[in-house]
Regions:
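N-terminal export leaders
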Residues: 1-2
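Ser/Thr/Pro/Gly-rich low-complexity, intrinsically disordered segments
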Residues: 5-6, 16
Length: 308
């Protein structure tokens, strides 16, 4: 789950959202190609899919749009921002006086909701440049409508906003927030999400692992079997639980309160993380993030984490 997705660093004009890693990728690809970049690779921009009255944010739209405006302002001060929206003129009115419009691009496109990390393209790199892998997003296992969100990546490529080889992977359900790459041949994911019967229920774990290894050219997949956040619609996306960092490091959510409903599951997750090994057979450096205090919104638990 996530409201934004990074767009890798451009190798051409800074005014284009061309997907190209430049020198960093060139050095990487001399060793291994193709590869699925890690989260910390250089990027040229960020995609936001903007909230509107037909999204699930309708009941608090003004408050949420204010939050998105703040996010857009911070992004556009630093890098290019792609805003996907069915109403670009309305969004321009909202942000024009606040956001650096020189760094903003718009894609007019119908959308169901705002979860760009999950419905956006997943980018592979090789010596010839970027490939934009377009998987099916089915509303986290058919929980929510997603037919419009599934058109965004194709429209962005057809309109020349995202430049790269478009790769149709719509025969497989996969969200960006459900996998984590270290950029060196290892994927981290969760069993609850990827083995959900409402995603790729016709495939078993072995078949899914073989498919992911083939598509992403990775050598190992680490499956977390435990861990969740109450109120999370994604079926335990890895990006809410554990993330790769440079130097064989994994940061993860830790719960030390034995009275918390998450305690047993997150303790089991932590134990499994200690059992994981790098491709060189070494244990990972594990850094625990404190579990944030509970926030209740209209009687329901609001999943969140602390970020420094």
């Amino acid at each position: 789950m996530g409201i934004l997705v990074g767009l890798p660093r451009t190798g051409g004009s800074e005014k284009d959202l061309q997907l190209n890693f430049g020198k960093v990728a060139d050095q990487q690809m001399e060793v291994r190609k193709p590869f699925l970049p890690a989260e910390w690779y250089p990027q040229s921009g960020v995609q936001l899919t903007w909230p509107h009255a037909e999204t699930d944010w309708a009941y608090m739209l003004e408050e949420v749009q204010k939050c998105f405006i703040d996010i857009a302002r911070e992004i556009a001060e630093r890098e290019l921002l792609l805003i996907v929206t069915p109403e670009p003129e309305e969004v321009k009115k909202q942000i024009a006086a606040i956001v650096n419009m020189e760094n903003v691009r718009f894609l007019e496109c119908g959308t169901n909701d705002t979860w760009a990390r999950d419905h956006g393209a997943i980018t592979m790199m090789d010596a010839d440049g970027p490939s934009l892998l377009d998987f099916t997003f089915n509303g986290w296992g058919l929980k929510f409508a997603s037919h419009l969100d599934n058109q965004i990546t194709r429209h962005a490529v057809e309109n020349g906003i995202l430049k790269g080889r478009y790769v149709n992977r719509l025969g497989f359900v996969l969200e960006g927030g459900s996998i984590e790459s270290d950029g060196m041949g290892t994927l981290l994911t969760t069993s609850e999400c990827l083995l959900s019967p409402n995603r790729n229920g016709q495939k078993n774990k072995v078949e899914i692992e073989e498919y992911l290894k083939s598509v992403f050219q990775v050598r190992q997949i680490l499956w977390l079997d435990d861990g969740y956040l109450a109120g999370d619609d994604t079926d335990s996306h890895i990006d809410t639980l554990a993330r790769f960092c440079p130097a064989d490091t994994i940061v993860y959510v830790q719960c030390e309160d034995e009275t918390d409903e998450h305690y047993e599951a997150l303790q089991a997750m932590e134990e499994q993380l200690h059992s994981f090994r790098t491709l060189n057979g070494e244990p990972y450096r594990l850094l625990a993030l404190p579990m944030a205090d509970k926030i209740v919104e209209e009687g329901g638990y609001l999943p969140h984490m602390l970020i420094s």
